[in-house]
């Protein structure tokens, strides 16, 4: 944000120079990116009036001008600007004068002597405007030093605001900070309430109260659109990086820079029946004041009349109702819009205006009436006109709530390492406009409406620190007790899990904890998301409940760049709402897409399948040395393909899911192929058991193969569990080596499962009879539970 130092000092004028002032702002967290003079070096530059203009006798593009600069005789000056004309007030550099690095001398141009130079804004360092010479107001005093006339003994401060300090996007906001730092009150203009002189009102209906909790309007008739914007407003706009457009628009911009409240003016004659603040309808379009036509979606907030959208709320007005030189009646708008709604629209259309810049960061929700009165006052002074009464529509329930925060002295000492006198704490906070009440040993602080970045105790302590002065905080040796956390050999570290995943060809991803609500709901409509009150962007408006939204976004990013074989994993926190509480759960998730292996000459390529990913998870479970307690079972997740998914269980607890992304979601997300996803609670796989020594058996093992026929829908995992529980400790290995579902000798709806069972006793040699008895018990158990038949 750019602003004039002179303008700032009208609000608060601390006894410090420019260098000290910028240092104070930077230490307060408002980093001053640059400090530049308001103009280049100017010597012997005065106001002049062109009293005669003739065409140069030997050059079509040059003019010979006689210019009155307040001396005995007019000067003859050769000028090449297309806008030079008789009666124009201009900036003239006299012979011997200096503009920047240029010293002006008497010169002969195509045979005509030029006794000076008429300047453009660019030559004087005022702006990049160079199409013609600078045109001064008609009442500019001839012979007046231009530096004094334009008050150019000034500096332009360019302040880099962080997203949380939207309250400082105005001269008033910066003045509040400077005043607090220097213990000075701020002055500013005398803001008055303008009485209505006509009874004209224009109907306003707010249909989107959550997106626009407060809307104030006013009709002003009899506006003179040909009036001249005062030079002091023009200069302040220029030094803030804005150009003059129209007296009404200039006043809107000036009040925005002064107070921080964006305003908009509609040509009242172009509005039909009334104002509606609503979301756009399907297939609606709007042509903006920059002549850009955009197609609106139903998520976009607009200001409309009864016929069409007339403005993109909080961002830019429409061309249809823009004020122009024929405008005689206007409807002024001063509103509070939800930061998230404005951010959503601005990001969607890749637009950032001075208005959206402020609304996205947050505007004081109590400022709208004040800004309306200030704009009305200036408009009547400059353009004339008769104002009507204020029209206000407000939904108090949807306005931001002002927090009351308890501040504890012990917390101040813990965070800053010092004790601050109780009276000083109260005074410092009151300098920031806060209401402070002492209750017992604590302070109860009510935050002003413009400080929407202060939400908790730590925020107050941060404000105390920069007002108290970081240079007053002594350097102390850190003291404290550090207890070494006990290390358990049964705890698997996250680093070990990461190593295994990378060993199996995965790349670790780190995605944002903030995700898009629409994508998260698409993947799991049953989940309740935690909404952010002030999201960084409209696409990151809720806390994630799963790692999958972030991983899918990474997949889309890579597929758009022709990378199709992707193996990703992530370990991160997820946040689940549970009533009025919320829970943090650390999860391990992954995504696999594309070919199972990199292309090679010795093996034909194939797509990754369910069992590839299942094998990776089985390897992960093996790390715990309790892999027998993990199982893959039937389970439903709305994001996964019902025929290619499974629930992950540890003992009897569901810890996650694995499967292919649902085909409908693949289409909606415009993915090239369905990826496989998995996710589980990290704590379920972080506990291992200590290995115990078991000597290898000296005695031979016996393997018996069996093939049973069961119903097709019987899970093989259930069969394995039943075999293990029935066979006892002599069974050391169970291996499925064949599944046959169709063909000769197999009934429809049945399948054949072949298993290899290996038996061994560590203390003796088993005999066939013992193994035969175990096999018979196993077959009997399988028949009872699954109606399994031994295949002939």
From Swiss-Prot:
One GO MF term: ATP binding
What are its cofactors? Mg(2+)
Q: Where, by residue number, does Mg(2+) bind?
A: 453, 459, 462-463
Query: Which GO CC annotations does the UniProt entry carry?
Result: phenylalanine-tRNA ligase complex
Q: Which family does it belong to?
A: Belongs to the phenylalanyl-tRNA synthetase beta subunit family. Type 1 subfamily.
Q: HAMAP family attached here?
A: Phe_tRNA_synth_beta1
What's this protein's name?
Phenylalanine--tRNA ligase beta subunit
- What is the species of this protein? Coxiella burnetii (strain RSA 493 / Nine Mile phase I)
């Amino acid at each position: 944000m750019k602003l004039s130092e002179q303008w700032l000092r009208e609000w608060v004028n601390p006894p410090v120079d420019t260098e000290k002032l910028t240092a104070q702002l930077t230490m307060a967290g408002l980093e001053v990116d640059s400090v530049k003079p308001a103009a280049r070096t100017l010597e012997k530059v005065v106001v002049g009036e062109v009293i005669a203009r003739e065409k140069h006798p030997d050059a079509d593009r040059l003019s010979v001008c006689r210019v009155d600069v307040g001396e005995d005789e007019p000067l003859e000056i050769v000028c090449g600007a297309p806008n030079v004309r008789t009666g124009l007030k201009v900036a003239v550099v006299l012979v011997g004068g200096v503009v920047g690095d240029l010293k002006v001398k008497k010169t002969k141009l195509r045979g005509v002597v030029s006794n000076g130079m008429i300047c453009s804004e660019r030559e004087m360092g005022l702006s990049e405007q160079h199409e013609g010479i600078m045109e001064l107001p008609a009442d500019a005093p001839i012979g007046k030093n231009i530096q004094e006339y334009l008050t150019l003994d000034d500096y332009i401060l360019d302040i880099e605001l962080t997203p949380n300090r939207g309250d400082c996007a105005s001269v008033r906001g910066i003045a509040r900070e400077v005043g607090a730092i220097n213990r000075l009150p701020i002055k500013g203009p005398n803001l008055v309430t303008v009485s209505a002189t006509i009874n004209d009102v224009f109907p306003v209906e707010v249909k989107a109260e959550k997106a626009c909790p407060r809307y104030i309007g006013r009709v002003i008739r009899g506006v003179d659109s040909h009036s001249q914007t005062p030079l002091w407003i023009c200069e302040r706009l220029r030094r803030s990086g804005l150009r003059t457009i129209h007296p009404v628009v200039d006043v809107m911009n000036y009040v925005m820079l002064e107070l921080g409240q964006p305003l908009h003016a509609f040509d009242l004659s172009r509005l039909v029946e009334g104002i509606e603040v609503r979301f756009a309808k399907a297939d609606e379009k709007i042509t903006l004041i920059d002549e850009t036509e955009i197609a609106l979606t139903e998520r976009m907030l607009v200001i409309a009349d009864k016929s069409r959208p007339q403005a993109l709320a909080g961002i830019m007005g429409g061309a249809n109702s823009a004020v122009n030189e024929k405008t005689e009646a206007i409807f002024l708008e001063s509103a509070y819009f939800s930061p998230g709604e404005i951010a959503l629209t601005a990001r969607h259309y890749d637009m950032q205006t001075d208005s959206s810049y402020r609304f996205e960061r947050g505007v004081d929700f109590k400022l709208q009436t004040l800004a309306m009165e200030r704009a009305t006052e200036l408009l009547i002074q400059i353009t004339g006109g008769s104002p009507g009464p204020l029209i206000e529509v407000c939904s108090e329930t949807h306005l931001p709530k002002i927090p009351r925060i308890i501040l504890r002295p012990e917390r101040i000492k813990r965070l800053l390492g010092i004790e601050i006198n109780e009276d000083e704490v109260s005074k410092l906070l009151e300098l920031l406009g806060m209401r402070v009440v002492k209750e017992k040993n604590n302070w109860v602080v009510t935050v002003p409406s413009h400080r929407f970045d202060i939400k908790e105790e730590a925020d107050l302590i941060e404000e105390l620190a920069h007002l108290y002065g970081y240079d007053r905080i002594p350097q102390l040796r850190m003291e404290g007790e550090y207890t070494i956390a006990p290390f358990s050999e049964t705890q698997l570290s996250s680093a070990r899990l990461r190593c295994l995943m990378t060993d199996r060809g995965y790349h670790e991803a780190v995605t944002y904890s903030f995700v898009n609500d629409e994508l998260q709901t698409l993947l799991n409509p049953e989940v309740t998301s935690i909404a952010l009150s002030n999201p960084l962007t409209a696409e990151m408006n809720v806390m994630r409940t799963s790692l999958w939204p972030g991983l899918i976004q990474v997949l889309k990013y890579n597929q758009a760049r022709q990378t199709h074989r992707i193996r990703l994993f992530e370990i991160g926190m997820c946040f689940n709402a549970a009533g009025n509480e919320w829970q943090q759960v650390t999860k391990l998730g992954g995504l696999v897409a594309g070919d199972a292996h990199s292309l090679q000459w010795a093996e034909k390529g194939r797509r990754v399948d369910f069992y590839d990913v299942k094998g990776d998870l089985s390897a992960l479970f093996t790390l715990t040395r309790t892999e027998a307690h993990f199982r893959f079972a039937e389970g439903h997740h709305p994001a996964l393909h019902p025929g290619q998914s499974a629930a992950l269980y540890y003992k009897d607890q569901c810890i996650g899911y694995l499967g292919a992304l649902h085909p409908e979601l693949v289409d909606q997300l415009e993915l090239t192929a369905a990826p496989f996803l998995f996710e589980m609670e990290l704590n379920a796989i972080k506990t291992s058991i200590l290995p115990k020594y078991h000597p290898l058996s000296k005695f031979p093992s016996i393997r018996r193969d069996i093939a049973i026929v069961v119903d097709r829908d019987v899970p093989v995992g259930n069969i394995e569990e039943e075999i293990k529980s029935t066979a006892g400790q002599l069974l050391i290995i169970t291996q499925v080596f064949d599944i046959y579902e169709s063909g000769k000798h197999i009934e429809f709806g049945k399948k054949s499962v072949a298993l290899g069972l290996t038996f061994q006793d560590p203390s003796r040699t088993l005999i066939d009879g013992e193994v035969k008895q175990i096999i018979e018990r196993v077959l009997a158990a399988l028949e009872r539970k699954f109606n399994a038949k031994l295949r002939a």
